[in-house]
Amino acid sequence: MGWQKELRNSVSTIEELKEYVKLSAKEETELGSVLKVHPMRVSRYYLSLIDWNNPNDPIKKMAIPSKEELDLTGLYDTSGEHENTKIKGVQHKYSRTVLLLSTNNCATYCRYCFRKRLIGLPTEEILHRFNSAAKYIQNHKEINNILISGGDPLTLPTKTIEKFLTQLSQIKHLDFIRFGTKILAALPSRITEDKNLLRLLESNSHTDRRIFFVTQFNHPNEITDKTLAAVDLLLKHKVIISNQTVLLKGVNDDYETMAALQNKLVSIGINPYYIFQCRPVKRVKNNFQVPLYKGYEIIEAAKKEMSGHGKRFRYVMSHNTGKIEILGIMDNYIYLKYHQARNEKDLGKIFKKKINQTAGWLEDLE
């Protein structure tokens, strides 16, 4: 089965899900209420990683809708993406980086997604005219890197990705190009079955301007032999891979799991990059967010089990005002630093806030 057919064959309805798990009438009703607002898509490969006998299976929690999504606590745009949109599908929050929203589709719709407002839904936020995006980037010489995101850009046809890379390669002030993707966890056949994609990536990853994949692995169970094959092919075709993990309640909120994940990533050739505090997104916050106090304890305990390479990541909140690193907690204060800032005057700023046991975001701190 080719990757396109595998993607089309994903599970997206209650009836299809019932091929894998028995649902009560009440569960069907609750699930139906969720799907009216936020659709489901799970690749059958990703479903195969779930242990259905384990009610607390971490991949099940990340991929399968639940009644907890009926909780409306939080906001849909927690990072100010609307404010940072310059033209449709083009966000320019940090002076050196432009983010392109290339699609609203993914191989699997993660239930904790911070772009829940647009994934799998009709939206006006997605890039439609790539020429306009390229022109914007060309006219802003301060930009030195591009993040092609979505949705998942690797769900796009290889010809579309080729168009992106062809135009971006002509912009001389770019130092590197990144693809934000979960495809290695959710549908690794996208990599292993498309030789044209691999040739395209290799031909555009030069000694002085590399192609990066920024992956998202949140649990060691997502790393399989098929993942290893995909990672190995990317590395052999000159792609550099780094990873962003989201700290998620009921998935990786214990130090053993977090340490095992980061150590495994290093061993297969993926560089730990960020661990993100789960954002207070509507229909996500109360189901997935870990309090900052507990999150810091988990991360610090996990670091004791890691090599230096494993703990190169930064534990951050991706806030409206910038990426805020959690430096430490002492005497009921949490110490924070702007690792990235929308206002460049804030860059590098260190500050402290009073911490409590339940605070999960900057606005929750005193």
Walk through the language-model features, giving the residues of each.
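Conserved catalytic-core segments centered on acid/base and nucleophilic motifs
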Residues: 100-101, 112-113, 145-148, 152-154, ...
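A short mid-domain helix/strand-loop element embedded in enzyme catalytic domains
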Residues: 103-115, 131, 136-141, 194
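Conserved, mostly hydrophobic/aromatic
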Residues: 46, 110, 273
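Canonical Radical SAM [4Fe-4S] cluster-binding loop centered on the CxxxCxxC motif
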Residues: 92-127, 179
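Conserved AdoMet/S-adenosylmethionine-binding subsite of the radical SAM
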Residues: 131-139, 154-306
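Flexible, acidic/Gly-rich N-terminal and inter-domain linker regions that tether
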Residues: 1-93
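Mobile, glycine- and charge-enriched loop segments
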Residues: 112, 141, 227-253, 333-336, ...
